[in-house]
Structures are given as C-alpha cells and as structure tokens.
C-alpha cells in the first residue's frame, strides 16, 4: 500500500453493516494486511487493520482486534470516555501546570485532545508510528490540525524519546498494537531514555495492563530508574496508570491530595478523589501520607 493510499480508508460502508453488535464505519489497511472478523485466535501481524465503529453514540478505534483502543462520545468529543485515559491524568495531582507534554501513541487522540482543550498554555507533541492512524484520528475523531501548541509526528516512539533529552515535563506512554504493549517502549533501555527525556521535575505516565504476565517486570524496570513510582488503578479493572517521578514528590499528605483532587475535579470533571483512594490501595503509605 502506498503512502497516498493510506491517507484515507480503503474500505467504507455508506450503509453500515453490523459486526459484533457495533456499526462498522470504516476499515483502514496498514502495511497491506487486512484481518477479517478477528477469527481463528491467531496473533495478528504487527501491521494490521484499523477499524472505526459506532455504538450508542460512541465512536471507537480498534487495531486488528476486538480491544477498544480509543473511544469518543459524539455529543462531547473532548470527554475522556475510557477510564484508563482518565486515570492517566492523575499526574495533575502532582504537576497541575504542565509546560510540555509528550505522548507516545495517538490512537483516537483522546488524551491529545483533552490536553489541547483544557491546557492552552501547554505544548503537546504526540508521536504515532502509523500515518494511517493519524489520518483516521483526524478524519473520524476530531484531532485538531497542528499549530503552535500541537504537533503530531510520525515516528517510532522509542527512537524519538532517545533523541530528545530533557524535552518535556510530562511523558505519557500508551502504545499498544491491539494485542500487547509495543516492545520498543517497555524495555529497560526505553525507561532509561524516558528518564533522560524528562526535565528535573518531570513525570512519566505509562498505561499498563495488570493482567499482563510481564506487568511486574515492566514495573520493576521503571522502579529501577525513577526516584518514586505511584500506581493508580483505572475505575474499570484491567488498566493501571503508572506514574514515575524523576525527582521524588516526597510523602504527600492524604489531606493535601484530597484537597487538590476536589479542586481538579471542579475544573476538569474527572474522578480525582477516586484516584487518591486508588493510590491508597496500591502504594506504600501510612495513615496520613502517601509513599510513607
């Protein structure tokens, strides 16, 4: 498939057909490989299809499997529909005014759009390995065009991070291929490069599946590099947002975190108080402090 052919969906149904109780809007072929209805249980090739579907007013992105990568509410395109994307915003409890956010993995652009809308003084750079995913995100998920605040770049996330030391104060990593986390962005070398890519007060935020047999290994790799690590379980079981701090946040008092959570909830509408309570269940703590 040529680059120009990837710019738009190669398969479109003006009269959508039902597939797994969803309406299929379009399927985009990446790398010349199109998977069928996810049959046979075979592990998909790295480059596969991008499917856009709709159900009950929610549009979703799939990468060659039934797993939902991104979702957008048509009535509110900037809302963070999936609970793991909301959990990844828990970093605001510690870094409420990010200056430059770098994201590895665009998907449907949920986090990119949220930062763009609610943080007008923040610069956002999003790295996506597939040009076709970028095209779909902009055509079907209302990801804005690049401007002085937003840049969406085509490239491999691990290589980009390695080439940009001390470039950002927040680095968000959500790179899955529909089956598992992309290996280039969960290695010990990647986490070391992520540490180097952050400013001194920076924080790495990684979306991990707690059902992944390698979850503990990934977490250990992060802990080996960063000064402090805090896990935030998503409201829907299965995902954990791992926040890793280049410089330790100390031992924040629970009362202070709850106060910050209430203020952030009022501003952004996310369940920050639940994030705080999730931290209590997942991390070293005392009755009065986190990481104590």
Task: Label each PLM-derived region with a short phrase.
Residues 9-14, 23-25, 29-56, 60, ...:
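SAM/dcSAM-binding transferase cores
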Residues 55, 78-196, 200:
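The AdoMet/dcAdoMet-binding core of the Class I SAM-like
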Residues 66-70, 176-179, 204:
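A short, flexible beta-alpha/helix-coil linker loop
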Residues 121-123, 147-149, 201, 226-228, ...:
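A generic structural signal for alpha->beta connector loops
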Residues 181, 208-212, 284-291:
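Alpha-helical subdomain
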Residues 188-251:
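C-terminal substrate-binding/active-site "lid" region of AdoMet-derived donor-dependent transferases
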């Amino acid at each position: 498939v040529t680059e120009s052919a990837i710019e738009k969906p190669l398969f479109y149904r003006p009269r959508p057909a039902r597939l797994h109780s969803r309406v299929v809007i379009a399927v985009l072929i990446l790398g010349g490989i199109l998977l069928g209805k996810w049959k046979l249980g075979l592990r998909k090739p790295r480059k596969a299809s991008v499917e856009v579907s709709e159900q009950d007013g929610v549009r979703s992105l799939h990468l060659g499997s039934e797993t939902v990568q991104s979702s957008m509410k048509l009535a509110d395109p900037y809302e963070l529909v999936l609970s793991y994307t909301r959990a990844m915003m828990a970093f605001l409890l510690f870094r409420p005014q990010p200056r430059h956010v770098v994201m590895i993995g665009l998907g449907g652009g949920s986090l990119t759009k949220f930062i763009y809308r609610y943080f007008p003084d923040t610069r956002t750079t999003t790295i996506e390995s597939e040009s076709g995913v970028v095209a779909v995100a902009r055509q079907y998920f209302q990801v804005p065009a690049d401007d002085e605040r937003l840049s969406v770049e085509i490239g491999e996330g691990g290589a980009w991070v390695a080439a940009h030391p001390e470039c950002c104060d927040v680095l968000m990593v959500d790179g899955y291929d529909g089956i598992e986390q992309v290996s280039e962005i969960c290695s010990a070398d990647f986490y070391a490069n992520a540490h180097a890519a952050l400013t001194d007060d920076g924080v790495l935020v990684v979306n991990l599946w707690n059902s992944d047999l390698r979850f503990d290994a990934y977490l250990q790799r992060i802990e080996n590099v960063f000064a402090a690590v805090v896990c935030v379980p998503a409201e829907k079981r299965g995902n954990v947002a791992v926040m890793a701090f280049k410089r330790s946040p100390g031992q924040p008092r629970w009362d202070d975190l709850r106060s910050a959570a209430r203020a952030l909830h009022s501003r952004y509408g996310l369940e920050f108080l639940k994030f705080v309570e999730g931290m209590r269940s997942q991390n070293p703590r005392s009755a009065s402090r986190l990481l104590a």
